[in-house]
Amino acid sequence: MILHAQAKHGKPGLPWLVFLHGFSGDCHEWQEVGEAFADYSRLYVDLPGHGGSAAISVDGFDDVTDLLRKTLVSYNILEFWLVGYSLGGRVAMMAACQGLAGLCGVIVEGGHPGLQNAEQRAERQRSDRQWAQRFCTEPLTAVFADWYQQPVFASLNDDQRRELVALRSNNNGATLAAMLEATSLAVQPDLRANLSARTFAFYYLCGERDSKFRALAAELAADCHVIPRAGHNAHRENPAGVIASLAQILRF
């Protein structure tokens, strides 16, 4: 079994760019940014429980990494960068720390490196279980209306929230809930030490209005790029800013 993905081919000899979306997104999420790099072959992946991979369920990050590895092999991707937002960034960091043959580097936008104590994990588990229950039982428009009121999305205006609620409500609530719990921060290890000892290039992107993740970025041994005029979802709020950072990273 492999993950559903859309592949766009570029020039031979350059590494692939493999894009991983955030929670409730899909393979289209990164395409406005990715298509600015047409010289590179691009793979836009649907993570388990999402988009064309909605029917694929996992028990945890190990399963996601295994599926990602098999997907890369199926596309004969031998050299690549992982580019991930939020959940996709956490998947990218986990997979990279576990080891992926051919990995050039990881570019993470607003991805959490992991909670650092049992109390934080227990609180996150309670929160994610409550959200998962709502995703399973309530209309998605109602759940996402509340989801985008969370502090991390404080930089969004009302129009942006309405647009995201409409977009995300096309998902399958039950499969979102399953993926939310399988990849919860409550079950993700703290990756700070592994990332400090890494053998791959590591870059971190965060919006200038995303104070939480700017603080987290400062804790990481990563080259950090702050995206102007953006909050947590920087590639949606300022795609040109993210394109500029990726171009600098890739020496485009």
Curated annotation (Swiss-Prot):
Keywords noted in UniProt: Lyase, Menaquinone biosynthesis
An MF annotation (GO) of this entry: 2-succinyl-6-hydroxy-2,4-cyclohexadiene-1-carboxylate synthase activity
Catalytic activity, EC: 4.2.99.20
Pfam families in alphabetical order: Abhydrolase_6 (PF12697)
Pathway, per record: Quinol/quinone metabolism; 1,4-dihydroxy-2-naphthoate biosynthesis; 1,4-dihydroxy-2-naphthoate from chorismate: step 3/7; Quinol/quinone metabolism; menaquinone biosynthesis
Protein function: Catalyzes a proton abstraction reaction that results in 2,5-elimination of pyruvate from 2-succinyl-5-enolpyruvyl-6-hydroxy-3-cyclohexene-1-carboxylate (SEPHCHC) and the formation of 2-succinyl-6-hydroxy-2,4-cyclohexadiene-1-carboxylate (SHCHC).
Family indicated by similarity: Belongs to the AB hydrolase superfamily. MenH family.
NCBIfam families: menH_SHCHC (TIGR03695), PRK11126.1 (NF008340)
Protein name: 2-succinyl-6-hydroxy-2,4-cyclohexadiene-1-carboxylate synthase
Species of origin: Escherichia coli O8 (strain IAI1)
